[in-house]
């Protein structure tokens, strides 16, 4: 499995943000759902080595997040909800900067591939600050996949996009999920139903359910994902 998590825990003072969760993930798109404050973003930050865990273990592509953080980062692409970008940079300039960080062998070739893959061609010569939110999200995603990682962690990648932009980003995520392991955090149930192969619902720092969408519906009298989510988290 590309991701393996065992009893992962994060404690802030007296508050347990993530409480001993365990799961595995392989190629495909894993929907990571939960209400605000459930521990989703904290889990993602631990998996991407932005913050250390308090207890438990996790590995990405066989590398432990505690003992081999640089190897984890080489094998993972992360698009945080805030999508930090250098708005004074041109699109190609920003991608070139990221390519330099990753020391890519043929940066120009890879940048061209990613620009085409993410649909940034028409905007590649603009400054990032001139782009719409949809294209900024594409730049963030392009940066995340530039070094061709096996694992992608995407935190609310379609937040604030219009319907046309949503379709484009969802299709891109779906295409990437054919060969990569993607952890997708979102509050949009239709998005999960459109692109995810499996769903984890986390509530109060614990995993409430971990299953495929068909199995989840079958076990809940074919209720909608939204109805299932409300039942599991409204307590």
Sequence positions of predicted segments:
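ABC ATPase "signature
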Residues: 210-211
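Catalytic Walker B motif of ABC-type/P-loop ATPase nucleotide-binding domains
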Residues: 152-156
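Conserved ABC ATPase "signature" region
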Residues: 96, 100-123
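Conserved ABC transporter NBD signature motif
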Residues: 56-67, 71-72
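Helical segment within the ABC ATPase nucleotide-binding domain
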Residues: 166-178
């Amino acid at each position: 499995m590309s991701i393996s998590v065992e009893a992962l825990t994060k404690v802030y003072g007296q508050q347990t943000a993530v409480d001993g969760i365990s799961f595995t993930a392989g190629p495909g798109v894993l929907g990571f759902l939960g209400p605000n404050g459930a521990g989703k973003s904290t889990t993602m930050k631990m998996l991407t080595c932005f913050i250390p865990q308090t207890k438990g273990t996790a590995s990405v592509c066989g590398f432990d997040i505690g003992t081999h953080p640089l190897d984890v980062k080489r094998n993972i692409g992360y698009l945080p909800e805030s999508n930090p970008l250098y708005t004074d940079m041109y699109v190609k300039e920003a991608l070139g900067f990221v390519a330099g960080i990753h020391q890519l062998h043929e940066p120009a070739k890879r940048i061209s591939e990613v620009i085409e893959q993410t649909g940034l061609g028409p905007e590649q010569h603009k400054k990032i600050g001139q782009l719409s939110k949809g294209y900024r999200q594409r730049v963030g995603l392009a940066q995340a996949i530039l070094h061709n990682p096996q694992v992608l962690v995407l935190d609310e990648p379609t937040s604030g996009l219009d319907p046309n932009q949503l379709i484009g980003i969802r299709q891109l995520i779906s295409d990437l999920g054919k060969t990569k392991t993607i952890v997708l955090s979102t509050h949009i149930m239709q998005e999960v139903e459109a692109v995810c192969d499996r769903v984890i619902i986390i509530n109060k720092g614990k995993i409430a359910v971990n299953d495929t969408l068909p199995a989840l519906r079958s076990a809940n009298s074919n209720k909608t994902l939204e109805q299932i989510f409300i039942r599991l988290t409204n307590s």
